[in-house]
C-alpha cells in the first residue's frame, strides 16, 4: 500500500512539474465608464479587449451618462479585485454612493483616469480624500502636453517600458497633492508643468491616478501598458500575460 501511495505521489509531482506552476486566477477588473466628454465607453471598451487579449484578467464593465444620475450596476465593484474609474460629475444614488464609499473605506484598489478626479458630483472630496489630488480645473486647449517620467520615478514598476509622448488634451491643474503621493509622470504645456500621474495609499489600499486619458492617449502603446501595469500594481500582483 505504501508503495502504491509513493508511486501516486511521485506521479502527481511529475505531472505538476511537467505542466508548470498552476496559473493564478484572473485579475478581476471592474471598468466604470461614465464620461461621454472623452468617450470613456469607447476607450474602455477597446482597452478591455486589449487587457483580456494580453493579460490574465477578466473584466466587467458598467456604464453611465456624463453628468448623469447614477451608474447602473456600479455595485459590481464589490466583486472585483480593482476598480478602474473613468467617470465625470455623476450624481450617484444614495445606495450607490454608500457602495462606493464603503469600497474606498475598506482600502480596496483604485485606478483613476482623467475625470475620475471629479467623478462624483455628490462626493467632491473624493479627489483629495481618496485619490490624493487637487484638481483645480485645466489650462484649456492649446499646445500638446509633453509627458515625461518624473525625477526618481524611472524605476517604478508601473513605468516599465514607458516612453515619453505628447498628449493632445488640456493639462489639468493639480499642484498641491497629498503628502504621501509619489509623482510618476509630469506634463508640460505652454510653459506650465503639472503632475499627471501618481500613486498613494488610502486606508492601506493602493491608488493610482492619471489626468491623461483622452481617446488618442489610449491609442499610445506606452499609455495602455502603464494602465495595465497599474492594475496589477494596485492589487500587489505581478504582471501576468496570457
Q: Model-predicted segments: where are they?
A:
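Solvent-exposed loop/turn segments at secondary-structure junctions
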Residues: 35-38, 65-68, 88-92, 110, ...
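Positively charged n-region of N-terminal signal peptides that target proteins for export
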Residues: 1-4
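Short alpha-beta junction capping motif
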Residues: 30-35, 76-123, 204
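An acidic, glycine-rich "communication" segment
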Residues: 25, 44, 113-191, 241-242
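Extracytoplasmic/secreted envelope proteins and their assembly/folding machinery
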Residues: 41-44, 48, 97-101, 123, ...
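Extracellular ligand-binding/catalytic regions of CAZymes and related secreted enzymes
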Residues: 22-27, 53-54, 63, 75, ...
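Bacterial N-terminal signal peptides
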Residues: 6-15
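Aromatic-Pro/Gly-enriched surface loop or interdomain linker
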Residues: 21-80, 238-239
